Amino acid sequence: MPREFTRSDRVSDAIQRLLAQVIPQEVRDPRLGMVNINAVAVSRDMAFAKVYVTFVGVTDEPKSLEGIGILNKASGFLRSFVARELSMRTVPKLQFIYDKTSIRGQELSSLIDRAIAEDRLHPQGDQTDDQQEGRD
């Protein structure tokens, strides 16, 4: 009987939960604000783990990249913590990546809202000059 989740999925989930607890408590850098661990993707051979993060209240990319640099410098320490807590023979090397999906989602949402507002200004019965020229 096949399993619902692969081992890498289970390890990803465990690492995500552990890092969400450990980073606020153990990484004491004043430049690092609140960190959200959005996802963890572990390779099939358990050698590498990409940790996708965002920072609460940070909207500009340079500050986010500074936070990513801090986390990547602390990745060795965090990796040893993961090894201790999860008792794994092979512990993935952690690579922190700034997750832009939430920002992209907000941009798309604002574009949709703008298009809806524009459609309300021009009901379907109205035709713009461009549409009228095409029918001549």
UniProtKB/Swiss-Prot annotation:
Gene3D superfamilies hit by this protein: 3.30.300.20
**Keywords on this record?**
Cytoplasm, Ribosome biogenesis
Its principal location?
cytoplasm
Output the superkingdom of the source species.
Answer: Bacteria
Q: Name one GO cellular component term.
A: cytosol
Q: Where in the cell is it found?
A: Cytoplasm
* Magnesium listed as a keyword: no
What's an example Gene Ontology biological process for this entry?
maturation of SSU-rRNA
Q: Which GO terms describe its molecular function?
A: ribosomal small subunit binding
Say yes or no: keyword Transmembrane present. no
Query: Quaternary structure?
Result: Monomer. Binds 30S ribosomal subunits, but not 50S ribosomal subunits or 70S ribosomes.
HAMAP family cross-referenced by the UniProt entry: RbfA (MF_00003)
As for what it does, the entry says: One of several proteins that assist in the late maturation steps of the functional core of the 30S ribosomal subunit. Associates with free 30S ribosomal subunits (but not with 30S subunits that are part of 70S ribosomes or polysomes). Required for efficient processing of 16S rRNA. May interact with the 5'-terminal helix region of 16S rRNA.
Record family assignment = Belongs to the RbfA family.
- PANTHER family tied to this protein: RIBOSOME-BINDING FACTOR A, CHLOROPLASTIC-RELATED (PTHR33515:SF1)
Q: What is this protein called?
A: Ribosome-binding factor A
Q: Which organism is it from?
A: Cellvibrio japonicus (strain Ueda107)
